[in-house]
């Protein structure tokens, strides 16, 4: 068995994850073979198993990296917003853009492939992943619900609602007839406007009602 330095191990593992990302994006999980990945990285199959126990474990690594990158992008976008209302709008715009442009993000959020894969892993494989806990998705929902103008007080409800919205915007592409549907970006804007307005109490309107 070939022995690698720590630097080489880090490099090869990164190359495997990147090659896996490209192949899984292009062909999907089922049609991608370990041989395809090892040929892309120019290593033998036996070397692959020094880094990952199975194709499933490689796919988990790919999806986890995509998840972490998504969280970083959303966090950066939200951090640049000036108000909670702008934070929600920016978060939704970023999520919608990512789901439409990145098939792996769509599979991660809409199809929940990461959790489905984790459920299929052996106990020892799941234990090996326990040392790398996931980032907190939509953690700012905990802060939003503390805002007096925010309509809901349950952050889990907010997170689940956002996931449902992302599913809705992705699924509309699957059911619409070509040439008859509204431009997706226009639909997204209308949906985001409606959601943002619905999540926050209109202080002026409430004052008038009183």
What do the predicted segments below correspond to?
Residues 86-90, 99-123, 171-175:
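Amphipathic alpha-helical segments used for helix-helix packing
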Residues 15, 23-57, 61:
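Helix-turn-helix
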Residues 1-11, 204-210:
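N-terminal intrinsically disordered/low-complexity leader segments
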């Amino acid at each position: 068995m070939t022995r690698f330095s720590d630097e080489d191990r880090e490099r090869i593992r990164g190359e495997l994850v990147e090659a896996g990302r490209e192949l899984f994006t292009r062909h999907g999980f089922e049609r991608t073979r370990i041989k395809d990945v090892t040929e892309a990285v120019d290593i033998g199959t036996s070397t692959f198993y020094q880094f990952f126990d199975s194709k499933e474990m490689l796919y988990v690594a790919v999806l986890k990296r995509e998840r972490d990158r998504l969280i970083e992008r959303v966090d950066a976008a939200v951090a640049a917003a000036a108000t909670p209302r702008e934070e929600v709008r920016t978060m939704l715009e970023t999520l919608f853009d990512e789901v439409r442009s990145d098939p792996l993000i769509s599979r991660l959020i809409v199809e929940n492939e990461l959790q489905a894969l984790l459920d299929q892993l052996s106990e020892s494989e799941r234990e090996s992943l326990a040392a790398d806990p996931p980032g907190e998705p939509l953690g700012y929902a905990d802060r939003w619900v503390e805002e007096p103008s925010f309509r809901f007080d349950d952050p889990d409800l907010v997170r689940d609602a956002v996931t449902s919205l992302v599913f809705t915007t992705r699924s509309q592409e699957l059911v619409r007839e070509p040439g008859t549907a509204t431009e997706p970006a226009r639909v997204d804007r209308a949906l985001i406007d409606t959601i943002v307005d619905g999540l926050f109490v209109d202080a002026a309107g409430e004052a008038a009602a009183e």
